[in-house]
């Protein structure tokens, strides 16, 4: 397959003139370095992947999750190159897929889903909040690598980060839930955010999509079937090839590695695994799982670290090697959109079983939900205080940004950006400083 990609996909929004001696790196190697060395990436080490699980240091953080997703992502690309050599020229380089997987979570706020719900509610009249939208905003404008363009990443890298390539105003439910009388009454399910890009970041989105023909741009922003109720959010249909690989790597890291955490930390029992996962995997339609599930179950709950690790590695490998590139069922002209990576349907069923098991027995349990609820309340408290008197309470540099943004009536977005960037511990510390009688700074 002959591929001749437009050199515009290597372009950066700000044409840089860096003083770099003998710099022979590719654009994507430079992108990877910028992400790795960014403050936003470092903060992931203090944002927990699953909250309230343990006080020990075994459990995963957002940072270790991102590193594992990156390793799986490069593994997916390597095996597709072997299996489908005709796509070699189109597939992302290791540096590019690494960049996407490392950056995919940097927009996540403190306290995970609880923090996301809180910020979305507090920003309900100011454009909303959503983790993926915040990731795009960080890399295109907030991270101080350049003055106005964030990390100033390559255009293809930014395209790969667009999991939901539409504005939030296009995906948000037509009828929002009513505001609550008091924040303690807020129900998380009512304020789960729509997926997309902030309307205030339209210029950055337009720049990323500039090389596409008009029909490709329109098609990329197309929605799935209309929701059954005007109270439901709309969902985008399409994404780039690079993004589809990153998303599969993220799903595998979540479904398999978070399962490992849950087993080691004693959050799930063998009986729960047998009933809610193993039984379904034995009937998922994939011959590998059907043949090996009994042995895998023994290994996962053997109590021996190296045996469990071998089982985890086997599951990751089985999922990873069942991924291939196929044409997208839509008439895209650009090759980056015309093809996506897909997992074989039966293996896809197995991955859904694993993800559902993690959600049911790890994420949705009261122990974790109480922690997220606490974080949700804490973030709303912070937002309420900072937005009530920003000039008094915001740090000096953030206060300057707020004053400038307020001229365009966008001060709330600056406060939201400030809170979203916090680590769990920093948010808790600031809350104590503002609200605890015992706090001495």
From Swiss-Prot:
Kindly give the InterPro entries that the UniProt entry links to this protein: dGTPase (IPR006261), dGTPase-like (IPR050135), dNTPase_2 (IPR023023), HD/PDEase_dom (IPR003607), HD_domain (IPR006674), PHydrolase_assoc_dom (IPR026875)
| Gene Ontology BP terms | dGTP catabolic process
Molecular-function GO term, any one: dGTPase activity
Q: Which residues form the HD domain?
A: 62-255
Q: Give UniProt keywords alphabetically.
A: Hydrolase
Spell out the SMART domains in the cross-references: HDc
Q: Which Pfam families match?
A: HD_assoc
Q: Which PANTHER family match?
A: DEOXYGUANOSINETRIPHOSPHATE TRIPHOSPHOHYDROLASE-LIKE PROTEIN 2, DEOXYNUCLEOSIDE TRIPHOSPHATE TRIPHOSPHOHYDROLASE
Cited NCBIfam families: antiphage_dGTPase (NF041026), dGTP_triPase (TIGR01353), PRK05318.1 (NF003701)
Similarity-based family: Belongs to the dGTPase family. Type 2 subfamily.
* Name used for this protein in its record: Deoxyguanosinetriphosphate triphosphohydrolase-like protein 1
Source species of the chain: Vibrio cholerae serotype O1 (strain ATCC 39315 / El Tor Inaba N16961)
């Amino acid at each position: 397959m002959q591929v001749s990609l437009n050199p515009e996909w290597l372009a950066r929004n700000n044409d840089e003139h860096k003083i770099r001696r003998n710099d022979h790196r590719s654009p994507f190697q430079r992108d990877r370095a910028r992400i790795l060395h960014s403050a936003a990436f470092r903060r992931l080490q203090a944002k927990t992947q699953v909250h309230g699980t343990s006080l020990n240091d075994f459990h995963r953080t957002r940072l270790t999750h991102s590193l594992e997703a990156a390793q799986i992502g490069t593994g997916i690309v390597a095996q597709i190159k072997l299996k489908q050599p005709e796509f070699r020229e189109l597939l992302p380089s290791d540096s590019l897929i690494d960049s996407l997987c490392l950056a995919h979570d940097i927009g996540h706020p403190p306290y995970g889903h609880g923090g996301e719900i809180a910020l979305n509610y507090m920003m309900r009249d100011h454009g909303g909040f959503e983790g993926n939208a915040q990731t795009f905003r960080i890399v295109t404008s907030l991270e101080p690598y350049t003055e106005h363009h964030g990390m100033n990443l390559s255009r293809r890298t930014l395209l790969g980060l667009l999991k939901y390539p539409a504005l939030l105003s296009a995906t948000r439910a037509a009828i929002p839930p009513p505001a609550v009388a008091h924040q303690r009454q807020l129900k998380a399910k009512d304020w789960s955010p729509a997926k997309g890009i902030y309307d205030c970041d339209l210029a950055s989105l337009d720049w990323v999509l500039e090389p596409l023909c008009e029909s490709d741009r329109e098609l990329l922003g197309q929605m799935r079937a209309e929701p059954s109720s005007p109270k439901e959010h709309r969902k985008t249909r399409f994404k780039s090839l690079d993004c589809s690989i990153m998303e599969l790597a993220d799903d595998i890291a979540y479904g398999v590695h978070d399962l490992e955490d849950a087993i080691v930390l004693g959050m799930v029992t063998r009986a729960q695994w047998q009933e809610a996962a193993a039984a379904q995997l034995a009937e998922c339609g994939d011959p590998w799982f059907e043949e090996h599930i009994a042995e895998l179950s023994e290994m996962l709950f053997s109590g021996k670290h190296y045996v469990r690790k071998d089982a985890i590695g086997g599951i990751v490998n089985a999922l990873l090697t069942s991924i291939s590139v196929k044409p997208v069922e839509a008439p895209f002209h650009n090759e980056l959109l015309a093809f996506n990576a897909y997992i074989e349907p039966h293996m896809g069923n197995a991955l859904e079983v694993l993800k559902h098991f993690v959600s049911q027995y790890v994420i949705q349990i009261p122990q974790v939900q109480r922690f997220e609820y606490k974080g949700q309340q804490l973030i709303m408290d912070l937002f309420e205080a900072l937005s009530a008197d920003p000039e008094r309470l915001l740090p000096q540099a953030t206060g300057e940004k707020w004053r400038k943004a307020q001229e365009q009536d966008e001060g709330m977005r600056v406060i939201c950006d400030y809170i979203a960037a916090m680590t769990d511990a920093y948010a808790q510390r600031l809350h104590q400083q503002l609200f605890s009688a015992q706090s001495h700074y």
